[in-house]
Amino acid sequence: MSRILKMNGRRQMWSQLQNEIILNDTVHINGFEGIGGMNRPVFMCRKLFVDNCDKNFIFYRLNKYSFPNVRELWLASHPTDPEVIHRPFDKIYLLDQYKYLQRYWAPRNTDIESVSYGRYLVELFAYYPENIKLHP
């Protein structure tokens, strides 16, 4: 079974990871509210799940600076701004409830796929939790 790093904004502070490089290949970020400090962590994951996060977190942190290697973004939070779904992730899986935003903001973007919340959960729960792997 594949593994996933689960991070919850109610239990972990973004500021505790300042300037860290996180090496986990798959990451789930849930419930982060603010944008934290300027010295952000860098996640080297290839697959990223994001849900229940604040609009400021989505706008300011969900980018190629914080997540340079992400190929698959599974977004179960409101995308906040057209810029977010135009960021250079290879594939964005966006919940059905935000499909209307894709129609307005990125109607010709074939890298965005609308998915049900059920499919999101099936994909997310296919992973076994693991501890954080920090760059030495």
Curated annotation (Swiss-Prot):
**What InterPro entries does the record tag this protein with?**
DUF5845
Instruction: Tell me the domain of life.
Output: Viruses
Family, per the entry?
A: Belongs to the mimivirus L163/R849 family.
Supply the name of the protein.
Uncharacterized protein L163
Q: Which species expresses this protein natively?
A: Acanthamoeba polyphaga mimivirus (APMV)
